Amino acid sequence: MSYYDNILEIDSDLNGNGLCIGIVMSRFNIDTSEGLLGACTTELAKLGVQEADIVLVTVPGALEIPLALQKLAISDRYDALIALGAVIHGETYHFDVVANESARGLIAVGLEYDIPIANGILTTDNEDQATARMTEKGAETARVAVEMANLALTLGEMDQSTTSS
């Protein structure tokens, strides 16, 4: 769909066929993390990503997710990565540190290694909020990963065609 005349618009799609997706999941707040994972992998399958093309790595907590994502990104095997976990507010400042630093780490890895990363780390005030959000957030991260993987591939092809001209 074109919104502006004479402007090239680059669209992406939600076709996951042929994409390889890496998932890093925190084991802290495991019930919520597993709920996110179930919704995410179900949606990935609906989008056409084959089970054999999905790799899951688990880590102790949200702060460990960026390092595991970095190791997956270095392998150059994945079209997109997904971070899953839950940071639930407690009575201390620790929540803010974990929520902010894990998000910062995801962005840093994605930009440094030129790979889309879908952030499925829930940050909520309590377990009830996390439970209420985990299904939609898990599915959403799958859609974001597939769409951004396709967009990155398209933009990469465009970049190669302009440099070879």
Swiss-Prot record:
Binding residue positions for 5-amino-6-(D-ribitylamino)uracil: 28, 62-64, 86-88, 119
GO biological process per UniProt: riboflavin biosynthetic process
Alphabetically ordered keywords of this record: Riboflavin biosynthesis, Transferase
A family per Pfam: DMRL_synthase
Pathway involvement of the protein, from the record: Cofactor biosynthesis; riboflavin biosynthesis; riboflavin from 2-hydroxy-3-oxobutyl phosphate and 5-amino-6-(D-ribitylamino)uracil: step 1/2
Catalytic activity, reaction form: (2S)-2-hydroxy-3-oxobutyl phosphate + 5-amino-6-(D-ribitylamino)uracil = 6,7-dimethyl-8-(1-D-ribityl)lumazine + phosphate + 2 H2O + H(+)
GO molecular function: 6,7-dimethyl-8-ribityllumazine synthase activity
InterPro entries: LS (IPR034964), LS/RS (IPR002180), LS/RS_sf (IPR036467)
GO cellular component assignments: cytosol; riboflavin synthase complex
Active site: residue positions: 94 (proton donor)
Positions bound to (2S)-2-hydroxy-3-oxobutyl phosphate: 91-92, 133
Catalytic activity, EC: 2.5.1.78
CDD domains: Lumazine_synthase-I
NCBIfam families (UniProt xref): lumazine-synth
Role description: Catalyzes the formation of 6,7-dimethyl-8-ribityllumazine by condensation of 5-amino-6-(D-ribitylamino)uracil with 3,4-dihydroxy-2-butanone 4-phosphate. This is the penultimate step in the biosynthesis of riboflavin.
Similarity field: Belongs to the DMRL synthase family.
Protein name (record): 6,7-dimethyl-8-ribityllumazine synthase
Gene name tied to this protein: ribH
